[in-house]
Amino acid sequence: MEDSMEEGRTKEKKDLLRALKNFFDRLYDGRNMKKIFITSIIIASVIAVITILCGVYLNDYYRADGDEIGLFMEDKTHITSYRIDDGVTLFKGENMRDVGLIFYPGGKVEAEAYLPLMTLLAERGINAVLCEMPFNLAVLDVNAADGIAERLPEVKKWYIGGHSLGGSMAASYLDSHPELEGIILLGSYSTADIGDERALSIYGSKDGVMNRDKYEQYRPNLPKDLTEIVIEGGNHAYFGMYGEQDGDGKADITAIEQMTITADAIEDFIDQ
């Protein structure tokens, strides 16, 4: 009986080995090797195309208008700016308060486009901190504000804000950092529930980029006492200085005029 059982187990092992051999023979015969090769080429080609498309998308962004910014900054020698961390720049004026604003740029907009706005805030005594984003997308570094308050202990009250996508990501950050004083949204809305926080929302009457339906849909996420300002004649792009933006309305005022109105409104909001 034992001999018979042993013979059965031996036969099962041989059958299993034979089956495995047949499987690999079929897998690696000429035809299947050709199929595997073709499949590998197709997969590699798809990956290459996706990589190229991603590269094109991420490198297609709105660049700061260096000439216009240079002209604006000519008489701003009283404003200093310096790096406090990799990709984080602080703007300071002559008579600074103990309040600061951490700012997230709009989606696919070069951070330098907001130098004029940061300068205008610094002139009003607000410590303005501009955060550069990976591939100019704040969604890739929502926590860019981490550690900034610790590096500037002289600033006692911190607000966070941003333009467009940057504003939405700033709101997400505020949602998990209630120690901040409030938020400033420029042409933006909050998908996070920050109804218990102070909030200022500013957008232009000619804004053709911000989705008004989404703005109203997510309006309940903001406090009931929201301070809302509509800049008459302003558009979406003129919170920065990067030229015209696709789909945007034509502004009736200049970018500097819009940014000056914005800086004044932020100062008033902080002073309340």
Residue ranges and their predicted role:
Residues 98-106:
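Short beta-strand element of the alpha/beta-hydrolase
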Residues 117, 210-220:
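Short alpha-helix in the alpha/beta-hydrolase fold that links the catalytic acid
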Residues 179-188, 198:
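A conserved short beta-strand
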Residues 162-166, 170:
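Gly/Ala-rich beta-loop-alpha elbow adjacent to hydrolase catalytic centers
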Residues 118-138:
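Conserved alpha/beta-hydrolase
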Residues 160-162, 186:
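Short beta-strand immediately N-terminal to the catalytic nucleophile in serine-hydrolase-like folds
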Residues 201-203:
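Short beta-strand/loop motif that positions the catalytic acidic residue
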Residues 21-48:
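N-terminal Sec-pathway targeting helices
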